[in-house]
From Swiss-Prot:
Transmembrane segments: none annotated. The lineage of its organism: Bacteria, Pseudomonadati, Pseudomonadota, Betaproteobacteria, Burkholderiales. One of its GO terms (molecular function) is structural constituent of ribosome. Keywords: Ribonucleoprotein, Ribosomal protein, RNA-binding, rRNA-binding. GO terms for cellular component: cytosolic small ribosomal subunit. NCBIfam families: S18. GO terms for biological process: translation. Binds as a heterodimer with protein bS6 to the central domain of the 16S rRNA, where it helps stabilize the platform of the 30S subunit. The keyword Secreted does not apply. This is Small ribosomal subunit protein bS18. It comes from Bordetella avium (strain 197N). Belongs to the bacterial ribosomal protein bS18 family. Gene3D superfamilies: Ribosomal protein S18. SUPFAM superfamilies: Ribosomal protein S18.
Length: 90
């Protein structure tokens, strides 16, 4: 004989369903940007983590063409010392 145990009751979520995720959208497509500039540091900082890593497109919702431009712009800004490679070590 198989033992199935007690049946678990279904939970009713009063808040949002944790499995439902909001659809991400590309900021650059919405703004009509044609090319990402390496001198626009405020925009570039939004796509870099505190430890210096570039945030992947699957988390930001950026389209592939803009993610490649963003990657190049961040690397170019790092090379020119406009952005740090890593976080500040205290």
């Amino acid at each position: 004989m198989a033992f199935f145990g007690k049946r678990k009751e279904k939970r009713k979520f009063t808040q949002q369903n944790p499995l439902f995720k909001r659809r991400k959208f590309c900021r650059f497509t919405a703004a009509g940007v044609e090319e990402i500039d390496y001198k626009d540091l405020d925009t570039l900082r939004d796509f870099v983590q505190e430890n210096g890593k570039i945030i992947p497109a699957r988390l930001t919702g950026t389209r592939a063409i803009y993610q490649r431009q963003l990657d190049s712009a961040i690397k170019r800004a790092r090379f020119l010392a406009l952005l740090p490679y890593t976080d500040n070590h205290n």
